[in-house]
């Protein structure tokens, strides 16, 4: 059984027992989270597609950790001007474990 959920402006295909890094949620480590924006639920050949969401479907998850991704380095360069600007960015994430899918 798997589902497609929306969180942080992105869509994720999830299955029970899976670990996932999503955009940061303001939830403490160890607490549970419920996602109610479920776009699709599939159990074998039985596929339920929402319009836009599946009514009554939820995905439950447990927060494992909070952290930051590796640094992404950005360089802005102006040709022929001997000018270069170096920057970096580290995005926050929340790691979750999918504990249940209810359709």
Curated annotation (Swiss-Prot):
InterPro entries: bL21-like, bL21-like_sf, Ribosomal_bL21, Ribosomal_bL21_CS
Gene Ontology cellular component terms for the protein in this record: cytoplasm; ribonucleoprotein complex; ribosome
UniProt KW keywords: Ribonucleoprotein, Ribosomal protein, RNA-binding, rRNA-binding
Single GO molecular function: structural constituent of ribosome
Keyword RNA-binding: yes
Domain of life from the UniProt record: Bacteria
GO biological process, one term: translation
Record note on quaternary structure: Part of the 50S ribosomal subunit. Contacts protein L20.
Function: This protein binds to 23S rRNA in the presence of protein L20.
Family affiliation: Belongs to the bacterial ribosomal protein bL21 family.
Protein name: Large ribosomal subunit protein bL21
Organism: Pseudomonas fluorescens (strain Pf0-1)
Species lineage: Bacteria, Pseudomonadati, Pseudomonadota, Gammaproteobacteria, Pseudomonadales
Gene from which the chain derives: rplU
């Amino acid at each position: 059984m798997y589902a497609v959920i929306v969180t942080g402006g992105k869509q994720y295909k999830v299955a029970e027992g899976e670990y996932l890094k999503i955009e940061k949620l303001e939830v403490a480590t160890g607490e549970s989270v419920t996602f109610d924006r479920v776009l699709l639920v599939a159990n074998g050949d039985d596929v339920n597609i929402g319009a836009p969401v599946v009514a009554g479907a939820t995905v439950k998850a447990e927060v494992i950790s909070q952290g930051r991704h590796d640094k992404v380095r950005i360089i802005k360069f102006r040709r022929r001007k001997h000018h270069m600007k170096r920057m970096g960015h580290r995005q926050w994430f929340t790691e979750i474990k999918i504990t249940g899918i209810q359709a």
